[in-house]
């Protein structure tokens, strides 16, 4: 089983990032995924020894417009195909070669889609894909939403997702999915 922390929209909130890192102690997190806004905020996670996977956000314009940095990524974890994107749909800052999130979702190319941008945490299923927005870690521009991040526990046939709320580090949303008969993914 692999345990992954997912965060988004940190917007240079160093105190929220420190709070997040203190919550990671003892959780046996192997990887941290940062979904952008702000790309450079994630460096401190790498410095603390986490294996970092990241994509830039739309406020990371110098990175988002750099063709050497992938705005969207497809990774595999325990045989689950996971699509990483800052926005849940195409954005006017996208590069021509960027995959369009809505097309990836419509054609069921992935099992899980991780995105941020809206600051609104949630776990949903659409068109056979589990959609996860970890929310945000930005005390200044929360848009009325609490500070949240996600923990994914993934094994070959099961996905457990928890949206954790700070500063209490309490579970706000919890859902479990499994691979059903054939290729389907169903909520347990």
Label the model's feature ranges.
Residues 1-5, 74-83, 125-131, 152-161:
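Beta-strand-turn-beta hairpins that frame and shape the catalytic cleft
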Residues 16, 93-98, 143, 169-178:
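A short, polar/proline- and glycine-enriched secondary-structure boundary/capping micro-motif
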Residues 107, 112, 120-127, 158-188:
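A short C-terminal boundary segment appended to hydrolase-like catalytic domains
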Residues 53-54, 93-158:
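Conserved beta-sheet core of the metallophosphoesterase superfamily
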Residues 11-15, 38-43, 59-64, 90-95, ...:
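Active-site environment of divalent metal-dependent phosphoester hydrolases
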Residues 1-50, 67-71, 145-146, 175-188:
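N-terminal active-site segment of His-dependent metallophosphoesterases
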Residues 6-9, 31-37, 53-58, 83-86, ...:
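Active-site neighborhood of phospho(di)ester-bond hydrolases with catalytic His/Asp-centered motifs
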Residues 53-109:
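Helix-adjacent hinge/juxtasegments
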């Amino acid at each position: 089983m692999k345990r992954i922390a997912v965060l988004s929209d940190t917007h240079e909130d160093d105190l929220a990032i420190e709070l997040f890192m203190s919550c990671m102690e003892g959780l046996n997190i192997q990887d941290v995924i940062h979904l952008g806004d702000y790309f450079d905020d994630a460096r401190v996670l790498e410095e603390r020894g986490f294996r970092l996977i990241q994509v830039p956000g739309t406020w990371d314009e110098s990175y988002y417009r750099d063709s050497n940095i992938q705005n969207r990524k497809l990774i595999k974890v325990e045989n689950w195909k996971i699509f990483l994107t800052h926005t849940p749909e195409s954005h006017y800052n996208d590069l021509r070669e960027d995959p369009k999130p809505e097309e990836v979702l419509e054609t069921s190319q992935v099992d899980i889609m991780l995105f941020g941008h809206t600051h609104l945490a949630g776990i949903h299923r659409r068109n056979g894909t589990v959609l996860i927005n970890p929310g945000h870690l930005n005390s200044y521009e929360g848009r009325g939403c609490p500070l949240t991040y996600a923990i994914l526990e993934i094994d070959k046939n099961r996905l457990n997702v928890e949206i954790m709320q700070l500063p209490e580090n309490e579970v706000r949303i919890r859902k479990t999915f499994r691979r059903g008969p054939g290729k389907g993914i169903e909520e347990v």
